């Protein structure tokens, strides 16, 4: 079955509609909130119509039908469907902020006309926690994208970059820099802490620059600890990536964090993406730089 299928799931308020619009712009036929009971028949219909690119969004509104989805996805893979499952996630604080800004109601929220703000937030937190429990199995079987700190336009660009990765590649690597002070990315498969490395922040001439700028690159390359850290990460990934590919992983996110997400982590992400890009599809994300 020559069909490229992308399944979008995730937390309410995490950006699923934005992701679906990005896929639509990329030429996918998109369906939002398809009931799981109709998935197999829908895919069979797309095959009859010789569709080649289809994207489906599912979420917690599917309710009691959600547990059947993982088995359905495995059956589709066995039938030869090229399937990529993406789960959009965000921190509870980020979701609370978005609901506060949009004043939309969470699909699992039972608040009816409550005017007490603390009580509204308490009920919303309960709804978010329940949703996490209901979607746990779907999250475990998907490639997770943390949208907590990225804008809609950035999410659209990132989704398009992911789906444009060659299908012939066994694995797509995503190298992501971040600042520990703003939290560890939820989508990280591996996290490396490089805060112990020499910090260009304390060099006045380098402070306003980033790990992509030549003066910072040259300064970091002069320090042996930086080279040793790079070698250790490179050797670890080289040892295990083939095993991850054999385990049918589509994406692996390697997050590298420093204090501000501006110099050391950015430098290492750039270097590692360049090195691994010779064999694998390697994408880069600089969370703090991209956030402006």
Swiss-Prot record:
Claim: GTP-binding is one of the keywords in the record: yes
Binding site for ATP: 10-17
Alphabetical keyword list: ATP-binding, GTP-binding, Nucleotide-binding
A GO term, aspect molecular function: ATP binding
Stored NCBIfam families: PRK05416.1
Family as reported in the entry's similarity comment: Belongs to the RapZ-like family.
Record protein name field: Nucleotide-binding protein Vapar_4338
Taxonomic lineage from the root: Bacteria, Pseudomonadati, Pseudomonadota, Betaproteobacteria, Burkholderiales
């Amino acid at each position: 079955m020559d069909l490229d299928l992308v399944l979008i799931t995730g937390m309410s308020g995490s950006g699923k509609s934005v992701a679906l619009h990005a896929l639509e712009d990329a030429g996918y036929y998109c369906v939002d909130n398809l009931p799981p009971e109709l998935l197999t028949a829908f895919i069979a219909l797309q095959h009859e119509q010789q569709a080649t690119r289809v994207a489906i969004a599912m979420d917690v509104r599917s309710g009691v039908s959600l547990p059947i989805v993982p088995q359905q996805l495995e059956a589709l893979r066995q039938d030869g469907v090229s399937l990529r499952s993406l789960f959009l996630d965000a921190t509870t604080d980020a979701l609370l902020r978005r609901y506060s800004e949009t004043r939309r109601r969470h699909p699992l929220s039972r608040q009816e006309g409550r005017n007490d703000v603390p009580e509204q937030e308490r009920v919303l937190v309960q709804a978010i926690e329940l949703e996490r429990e209901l979607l746990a199995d779907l999250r475990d079987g998907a490639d997770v994208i943390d949208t907590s700190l990225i804008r809609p336009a950035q999410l659209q660009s990132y989704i398009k970059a992911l789906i444009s990765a060659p299908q012939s590649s066994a694995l797509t690597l995503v190298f992501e820099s971040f600042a520990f002070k703003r939290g560890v990315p939820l989508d990280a498969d591996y996290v490396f802490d490089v805060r112990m490395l020499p910090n260009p922040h304390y060099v006045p001439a380098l402070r306003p620059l980033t790990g992509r700028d030549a003066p910072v690159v040259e300064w970091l390359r002069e320090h042996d600890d930086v080279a040793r850290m790079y070698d250790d990460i490179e050797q670890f990934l080289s040892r295990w990536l083939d095993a991850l590919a054999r385990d049918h992983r589509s994406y692996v996110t390697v997050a590298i964090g420093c204090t501000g997400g501006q110099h050391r982590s950015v430098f290492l992400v750039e270097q590692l993406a360049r090195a691994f890009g010779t064999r694998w599809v390697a994408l880069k994300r600089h969370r703090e730089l991209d956030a402006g």
